[in-house]
């Protein structure tokens, strides 16, 4: 005779979680593979107490974002759209022109698209720092090096 009254689901509270800082070197790595590794860390899916509706993930620092690779012909053919919110205000950029203007933007756009939409996704995106080269101001944090494929 089993009674199921004593079984309780335990939820981890974000205030008890110590956030770590991970650094990913993006030089000569594929953009999508870097983005998926970063999102996994940001969401906290690498932890045993992952909860989809809470910010239990860690902070991610990506360096050398300007040296990221693309597969196929995406360097010339991938198009990024943005809108000014005025009639006829649709603008488009190829990967080449966008990365020349702002080298961190393609990686940030890829990661933002993989995060949940809404307040939680915006909160998780604030835990991401992307730098175009190896120089960054976060060396005072205890950074753990993460190897991505």
Curated annotation (Swiss-Prot):
Superkingdom of source: Bacteria
InterPro entries the record matches: Ribosomal_uL13, Ribosomal_uL13_bac-type, Ribosomal_uL13_CS, Ribosomal_uL13_sf
Coiled-coil ranges per UniProt: none
Transmembrane segments: none
GO cellular component entries: cytosolic large ribosomal subunit
The keyword Transcription regulation is annotated on this UniProt entry: no
An example Gene Ontology biological process: translation
Keyword vocabulary terms for this entry: Ribonucleoprotein, Ribosomal protein
MF annotations from Gene Ontology: mRNA binding; structural constituent of ribosome
Function: This protein is one of the early assembly proteins of the 50S ribosomal subunit, although it is not seen to bind rRNA by itself. It is important during the early stages of 50S assembly.
Similarity-based family: Belongs to the universal ribosomal protein uL13 family.
Subunit text: Part of the 50S ribosomal subunit.
Name of the protein in question: Large ribosomal subunit protein uL13
Naturally occurring in which organism (per UniProt): Borrelia duttonii (strain Ly)
């Amino acid at each position: 005779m089993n009674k199921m009254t004593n079984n309780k689901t335990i939820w981890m509270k974000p205030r008890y979680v110590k956030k770590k800082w991970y650094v990913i070197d993006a030089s000569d790595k594929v953009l999508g593979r870097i983005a998926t590794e970063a999102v996994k860390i940001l969401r906290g899916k690498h932890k045993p107490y992952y909860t989809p509706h809470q910010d239990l993930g860690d902070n991610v620092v990506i360096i050398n974002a300007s040296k990221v690779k693309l597969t196929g012909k995406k360097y010339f053919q991938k198009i990024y759209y943005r809108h000014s919110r005025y009639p006829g205000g649709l603008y488009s950029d190829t990967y080449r022109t966008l990365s020349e203007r702002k080298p961190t933007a393609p990686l940030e756009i890829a990661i933002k698209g993989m995060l949940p939409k809404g307040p939680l996704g915006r909160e998780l995106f604030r835990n991401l720092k992307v730098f175009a080269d190896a120089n960054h101001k976060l060396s005072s944090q205890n950074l753990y090096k993460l190897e991505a494929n």
